[in-house]
């Protein structure tokens, strides 16, 4: 895992097209902004895991109609 230190307003690049900017820090929360092309999905981890489990549940149903 790469660990970086950034200040508010500073940005990091992921590849050529994705930027992550630190927007603010308040207590133990960090607000970040992600700028990515439309074809790149960006989700919070808990939302991504829910999407993946729903996909797994739908594919295991086998399409019985």
From Swiss-Prot:
GO terms for molecular function: mRNA 5'-UTR binding. It is found in: Cytoplasm. Gene3D superfamilies: Translational regulator CsrA (2.60.40.4380). GO terms for biological process: mRNA catabolic process; negative regulation of translational initiation; positive regulation of translational initiation; regulation of carbohydrate metabolic process. Keywords: Activator, Cytoplasm, Repressor, RNA-binding, Translation regulation. It holds the Pfam family CsrA. The keyword RNA-binding applies. Its main location: cytoplasm. Coiled coil: none annotated. Disulfide bonds: none annotated. One of its GO terms (cellular component) is cytosol. Homodimer; the beta-strands of each monomer intercalate to form a hydrophobic core, while the alpha-helices form wings that extend away from the core. Belongs to the CsrA/RsmA family. A key translational regulator that binds mRNA to regulate translation initiation and/or mRNA stability. Mediates global changes in gene expression, shifting from rapid growth to stress survival by linking envelope stress, the stringent response and the catabolite repression systems. Usually binds in the 5'-UTR; binding at or near the Shine-Dalgarno sequence prevents ribosome-binding, repressing translation, binding elsewhere in the 5'-UTR can activate translation and/or stabilize the mRNA. Its function is antagonized by small RNA(s). This is Translational regulator CsrA. It comes from Shewanella woodyi (strain ATCC 51908 / MS32). The gene is csrA.
